[in-house]
């Protein structure tokens, strides 16, 4: 491990011990994570007993799921589940593409993150056979705002609180666990606290860090620590890929020189 990775471990230890961090996030979807960097992340998080949550590219991203199994993630999240049929496709993949003993060790969540998904949520909660294969739902507030032609600053509004409360109440009636994500920051403390007080969420998440619902009681420092971890992670990635780039640039220069000489 290098100096940056040891610093990441220090931040993660603080997040785990003092801030209520319970999982670390990664994405094949918007983040476009590569297997090499995910194996490094898994090495770091495993040393501290923090499991990885992986967002896959879609409800039928079979290759992503197989990569999740190879890494050994604790939870898989499917994005943009907007209709009962999308939920069915996700449940079908879980049932038919993942061995039961593997599936038993993984929590399967899906994201409700568009106004279309919200409008169809009651119908999705009526799909009992498909719900049997999933463990929970996370609301992605930034994409939800975008689907409503709203700025991300709207995510802590009363309108969004009403949407989240109604969605989570329906999910709770079906025994699902509930998570909140999307522009989670110090400004979200009251929003999170109100949902937690009603017993409607189990966790909330920043871009890279997942907290237990009651972690909001630790105050603003948890969000600063989450940002610090993300910063160290990005610096670690930059260090690795900068090294690869330098190696490739040296090789490119040599090949261009050799090709130029052969044409003369």
Residue ranges and their predicted role:
Residues 1-264:
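Expand to "…catalyze enediolate/carbanion chemistry for C-C bond making/breaking, isomerization
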């Amino acid at each position: 491990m290098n100096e940056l990775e040891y610093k990441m471990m220090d931040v993660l230890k603080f997040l785990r011990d003092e801030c209520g961090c319970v999982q670390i996030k990664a994405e094949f979807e918007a983040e476009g994570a590569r297997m090499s960097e995910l194996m490094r992340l898994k090495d770091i998080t495993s040393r501290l007993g923090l499991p990885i949550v992986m967002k896959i590219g879609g409800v039928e991203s079979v290759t992503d799921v197989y990569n999740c199994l190879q890494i050994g993630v604790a939870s898989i999240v499917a994005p943009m589940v907007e209709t009962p049929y999308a939920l069915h496709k996700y449940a079908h993949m879980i049932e038919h593409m993942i061995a039961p003993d593997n599936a038993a060790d993984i929590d399967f969540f899906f994201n409700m993150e568009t106004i279309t998904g919200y409008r169809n949520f009651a119908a999705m909660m009526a799909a009992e056979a498909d719900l049997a294969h999933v463990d929970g739902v996370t609301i992605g507030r930034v994409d939800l705002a975008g689907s409503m032609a709203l700025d991300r600053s709207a995510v802590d509004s009363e309108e969004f609180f009403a949407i989240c409360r109604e969605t989570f109440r329906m999910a709770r009636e079906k025994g699902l666990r509930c998570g909140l994500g999307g522009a989670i920051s110090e400004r979200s403390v009251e929003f999170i606290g109100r949902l937690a007080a009603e017993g409607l969420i189990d966790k909330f998440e920043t871009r890279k860090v997942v907290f237990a619902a009651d972690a909001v009681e630790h105050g603003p420092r948890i969000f600063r620590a989450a940002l610090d971890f993300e910063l160290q992670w990005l610096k670690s990635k930059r260090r690795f890929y900068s090294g690869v780039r330098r190696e490739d640039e040296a090789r490119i220069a040599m090949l261009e020189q050799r090709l130029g000489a052969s044409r003369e």
